């Protein structure tokens, strides 16, 4: 299914390429860049189509000094203009979760109403604040967002502004005229205040099309040359009298000084209704109209008689309203047709959007009569006027990690489809379909239809945890193609099914629990058989098929810098009786996860993590073999190291999960360390002998084995997660072989029922050749010993980096230093990586090294690996906090605290105020917080919706202070704690027990791992494999 094309909307295509299209003027939140940081832009950019006629622009020359009249006007206007900083906390309808800046202006100083754009007020959960000209700040909440037109109204408390006299701008929509000189006063380009001048060139422009996001329609727009940019959305367009005559909405993004303003007729009506305490009625017949000039209308069949009548009644008019899109199943379906020219409504000659809106808004639930001309024939129809608010979603449901609501009128109009269906606005968790964040329509779940949100909820209530059900779906961009998938319903990491309903009284979205999760059904043993390899001449390859299982790992939270929420690959069964499987740690990076194993492409069973190797990129997992009635075979692992030039058989799995076989030879065995990821430290293999082979299949296959003719496995073929490239922001993945003898000691202990408690040297090394070693002070005697001990590779190991000790501990004197050349450990000459294995069982090792040209003996401590794995995570204000994991200690020289920011959610306070991943938190409100316990204690004292100070240190050792506002409503604090007594191995705890008395962490959009970023270059671009 191709989901990367343009929106399939029924509208004319612009000849302008997307890069040249205009855009809305949101200013992506800079996230208060930390010293030494380069936090990415995180707003949403909207491209819009353009229908400019260059001959109609009235560009202005270089800015001249304003006249005294304009200066006096601006001095008064700026007192009413505010800078709005806001977030949409979760994806909803046309918008993704985001943080951004825009502009608004006070339109009622007594009641505290601010007018701004609808794309600022947001269709979904909103939180934000505004800053006045004198830098006073106050919270704002939404009062009204129009279902169609690009305006909304925010409310603030006038009593909160104590140091300036509030003033308001009068709305005067009838003062907008072609040739009028105007000023756009706002937060242009994210600046506190910018004043841009321009001249109105058009009053009859059709509403700009903003691509696949929100777009205004059924209104005319005003066009001017003002050159506004990001952050000016919602700015007042004022005339010399100081009256607001339009609302800044969008403009060209290609550098042309062209801007688009919304007329204020409908905002003025909405404001007056709100002032009177009346509902803002909005009527619709689910039809999009556009303005077309008389010459086009004549081609559509407008008769000369009607043209003469219209021109006589409205001499200044040059265009008429023409039906562009009629939604199926809407009031006008089967009555109006595309291309109908509107003549009259209720007997009144009508050529303008404003009057059409007037009639429809005052006729909700009533019938209107429309006279249109179709191909030269008069056609009169009657339509029932529907309620526009009724087809605009004001609620959503979160379940199994995904977020859903009824399909909106905005999306229906964009794609010309009926306004019904269940829309996936946040495709995550169980409902992450085909690596697309949103846009799915769910047709059925578990073979039951889901025509609307209520039906979907009722179906989901009946599905037990850990069930696998069939869902049928389509993407809104490609409704011709129906997809069918089997999804794994996760109700243990996401136990609550929660309903959020918009509350226009409070400006918040109220959450309620719909149903608890049904417990998982007990697993049932299944039978299966393995495939037979046709045409494969190597019997050993045919046998090894029975030792492979497919492994799928899903992470409910991003930890340890791992960039994905789901990964799939293959593992090798090393003990079929005990259900032990070895898999790459690039597939199972940590144990806060769900693991599903597929045996013989038929049987699916759950598995758990048994062992994570800290250095060599493998994880051992275990499934219940009693559930698998299939001839699974334990792979035989070689006890001898594979050698360069040795013949071998490569057996791997390609990108289609199909097994491939090739007879080949070992080209090289090289000591490597996977490159570190600069933007966000994450697990990587180091001090590793990597096997490469002479076949092109090795690069295509991420998992497999190298086996001999006797069927003995000589090496595992694993994928290794590497660095992210600065240019493409894509993660590099290496495919290398790992010799099995290094695996045997760990597997043997686990088979004996003993959990390996390895110890490691806290350093990373790399190979030095004898020419380098000689220059660095290694004696000829030792060089001779090296050549005799390892005839195939004359090498020693130099310390590249020493791991940072825990916070509060200084580097110990008797340990390695960068640049040390290692000669022996406990008297054994070290020329191979495998010889470093002596470190695993000893607390101290006696090392002979060459440092600064001098031989010396030191006693070096080893580090217990049990302390390196993450066992706790705190989610606070959208930031995932954890103890610095091993990769952090490998890449940093000093730990500033035990509180490391691992990730943050879009639309959260952490995102808004710039608490970036890879930062360390050292204090809260001046109180030192060296560890998570102290941090949780201090932040628990902070009341909701209150500012507090965090002292932080960047990864590059630059201290700074961030001020944040706590938001417990959308981002309550919760914890993930490792607990072997729990079925998942972890438990969740909420610190917001006043609202969640059961103590279980709430299922909230801020815990969606796909909405989290982990480094200053954003989220991963590696696409997870399709199931």
UniProtKB/Swiss-Prot annotation:
Tell me the Pfam families matching this sequence: PDZ_1 (PF12812), PDZ_6 (PF17820), Trypsin_2 (PF13365)
Q: Which residues form the active site?
A: 119, 150, 232
Q: Where in the cell is it found?
A: Nucleus
Q: Which GO terms describe its biological process?
A: apoptotic process; proteolysis
Instruction: Print the keywords alphabetically.
Output: Apoptosis, Hydrolase, Nucleus, Protease, Repeat, Serine protease
Record's compositionally biased regions (Polar residues): 31-42
Entry's CDD domains? cpPDZ1_ScNma111-like, PDZ2-4_Nma111p-like
Q: Which residues form a coiled coil?
A: none
SUPFAM superfamilies under this entry?
PDZ domain-like, Trypsin-like serine proteases
Q: Name one GO molecular function term.
A: serine-type endopeptidase activity
What does the entry list under GO cellular component?
Answer: nucleus
Annotated ranges, domain PDZ: 288-373, 875-956
Q: Provide the function of this protein.
A: Nuclear serine protease which mediates apoptosis.
How is this protein named in the record?
Answer: Pro-apoptotic serine protease nma111
This protein's species is: Aspergillus oryzae (strain ATCC 42149 / RIB 40) (Yellow koji mold)
Taxonomy of the source species:
Eukaryota, Fungi, Dikarya, Ascomycota, Pezizomycotina
Report which gene this protein is encoded by.
Answer: nma111
């Amino acid at each position: 299914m191709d989901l990367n094309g343009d929106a399939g909307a029924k509208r004319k295509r612009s000849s302008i390429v997307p890069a040249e299209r205009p855009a809305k003027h949101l200013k992506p939140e800079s996230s208060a860049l930390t010293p030494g940081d380069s936090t990415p832009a995180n707003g949403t950019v909207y491209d819009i189509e353009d229908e400019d006629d260059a001959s109609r622009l009235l560009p202005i020359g270089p800015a001249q000094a304003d006249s005294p009249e304009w200066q006096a006007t601006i001095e008064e206007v700026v007192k009413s203009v505010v800078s709005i900083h806001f977030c949409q906390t979760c994806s909803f309808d046309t918008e993704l979760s985001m943080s951004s800046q825009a502009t608004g202006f006070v339109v009622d100083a007594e009641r505290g109403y601010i007018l701004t754009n609808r794309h600022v007020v947001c269709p979904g959960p909103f939180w934000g604040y505004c800053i006045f000209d004198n830098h006073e700040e106050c919270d704002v909440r939404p009062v009204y967002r129009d279902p169609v037109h690009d305006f909304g109204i925010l409310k603030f408390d006038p009593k909160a502004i104590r140091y300036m006299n509030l003033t308001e701008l009068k709305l005067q929509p009838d003062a907008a005229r072609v040739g009028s000189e105007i000023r756009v006063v706002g937060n242009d380009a994210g600046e506190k205040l910018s004043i841009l001048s321009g001249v109105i060139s058009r009053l009859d422009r059709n509403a700009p099309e903003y691509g696949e996001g929100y777009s205004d329609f059924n209104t005319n727009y005003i066009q001017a040359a003002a050159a506004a940019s990001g952050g000016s959305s919602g700015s007042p367009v004022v005339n010399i009298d100081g009256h607001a005559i339009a609302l800044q909405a969008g403009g060209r993004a290609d550098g042309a000084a062209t801007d688009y303003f919304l007329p204020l007729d409908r905002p003025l009506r909405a404001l007056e209704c709100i002032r009177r305490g009346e509902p803002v009625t909005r009527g619709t017949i689910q039809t999009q109209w556009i303005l077309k000039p008389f010459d086009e209308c004549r081609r559509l069949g407008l008769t000369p008689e009607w043209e003469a009548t219209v021109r006589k009644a409205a001499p200044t008019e040059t265009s008429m309203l023409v039906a562009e899109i009629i939604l199926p199943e809407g009031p006008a379906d089967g009555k109006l047709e595309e291309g109908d020219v509107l003549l009259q409504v209720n007997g009144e000659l009508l050529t303008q959007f404003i009057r059409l809106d007037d009639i429809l808004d005052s006729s909700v639930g009533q019938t209107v009569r429309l006279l249109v001309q179709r191909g030269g024939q008069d056609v009169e129809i009657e339509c029932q006027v529907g309620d526009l608010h009724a087809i605009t979603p004001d609620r959503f449901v979160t379940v199994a990690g995904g977020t859903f609501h009824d399909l909106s009128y905005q999306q229906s109009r964009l794609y010309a489809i009926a306004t019904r269906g269940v829309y996936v606005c946040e495709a995550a968790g169980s409902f992450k379909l085909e690596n697309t964040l949103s846009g799915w329509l769910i047709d059925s779940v578990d073979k039951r239809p889901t025509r609307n949100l209520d039906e979907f909820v009722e179906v989901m209530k009946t599905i037990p945890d850990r069930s696998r059900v069939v869902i049928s779906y389509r993407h809104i961009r490609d409704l011709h193609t129906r997809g069918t998938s089997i999804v794994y319903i996760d109700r243990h990491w996401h136990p609550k099914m929660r309903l959020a309903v918009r509350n226009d009284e409070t400006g918040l979205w109220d959450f309620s629990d719909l149903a608890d999760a049904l417990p998982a059904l007990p697993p049932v043993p299944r039978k299966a058989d393995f495939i037979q390899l046709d045409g494969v001449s190597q019997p050993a390859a045919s046998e090894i098929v029975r030792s492979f299982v497919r492994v799928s790992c899903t992470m409910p939270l991003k930890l340890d810098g791992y960039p994905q929420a789901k990964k799939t690959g293959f593992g090798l069964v090393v003990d079929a009786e005990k259900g032990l499987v070895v898999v790459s740690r690039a597939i199972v990076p940590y144990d806060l996860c769900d693991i599903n194993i597929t045996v013989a492409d038929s049987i699916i069973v759950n598995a758990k993590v048994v062992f994570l190797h800290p250095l060599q990129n493998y994880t051992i997992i275990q499934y219940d073999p009693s559930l698998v009635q299939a001839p699974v075979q334990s792979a035989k692992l070689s006890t001898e190291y594979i050698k360069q030039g040795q013949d071998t058989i490569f057996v791997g799995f390609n990108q289609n999960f199909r097994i491939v076989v090739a007879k080949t030879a070992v080209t090289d065995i090289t000591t490597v360390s996977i490159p570190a990821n600069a933007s966000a430290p994450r697990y990587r293999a180091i001090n590793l002998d990597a096997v490469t082979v002479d076949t092109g299949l090795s690069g295509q296959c991420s998992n497999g084995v190298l086996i001999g003719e006797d069927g003995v496995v000589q090496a595992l073929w694993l994928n290794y997660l590497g660095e992210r490239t600065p240019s493409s922001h894509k993660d590099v993945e290496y495919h290398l072989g790992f010799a099995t003898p290094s695996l045997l000691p760990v597997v043997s202990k686990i088979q004996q029922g003993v959990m390996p408690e390895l110890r490691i040297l806290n350093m990373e090394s790399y190979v030095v050749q004898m020419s380098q070693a000689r220059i660095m002070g290694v004696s000829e005697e030792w060089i001779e010993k090296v050549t005799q001990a390892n005839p195939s590779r004359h090498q020693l190991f130099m310390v590249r980096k020493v791991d940072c000790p825990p916070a509060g501990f200084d580097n110990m004197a008797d340990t390695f230093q960068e640049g040390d050349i290692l000669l022996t450990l406990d008297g054994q000459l070290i020329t191979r990586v495998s010889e470093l294995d002596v470190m695993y069982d000893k607390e101290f090792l006696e090392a002979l090294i060459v440092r600064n040209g001098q031989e010396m003996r030191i006693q070096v401590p080893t580090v217990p690996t049990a302390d390196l794995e993450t066992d706790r995570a705190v989610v606070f204000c959208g930031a995932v906090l954890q103890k610095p994991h091993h990769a952090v200690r490998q890449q940093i020289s000093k730990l500033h605290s035990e509180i490391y920011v691992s990730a943050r959610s879009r639309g959260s306070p952490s995102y808004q105020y710039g608490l970036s991943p890879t930062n360390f938190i050292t204090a809260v409100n001046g109180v030192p917080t060296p560890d998570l316990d102290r941090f949780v204690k201090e932040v628990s004292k902070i009341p909701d919706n209150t500012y507090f100070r965090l002292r932080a240190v960047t990864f590059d050792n630059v201290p700074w202070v961030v001020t944040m506002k706590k938001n417990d409503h959308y981002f309550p604090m919760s914890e993930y704690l490792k607990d072997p007594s729990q079925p998942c191995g972890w438990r969740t705890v909420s610190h917001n027990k006043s609202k969640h008395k059961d103590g279980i962490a709430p299922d909230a959009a801020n815990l969606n791992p796909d909405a989290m970023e982990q480094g200053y270059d954003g989220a991963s671009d590696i696409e997870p494999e399709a199931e």
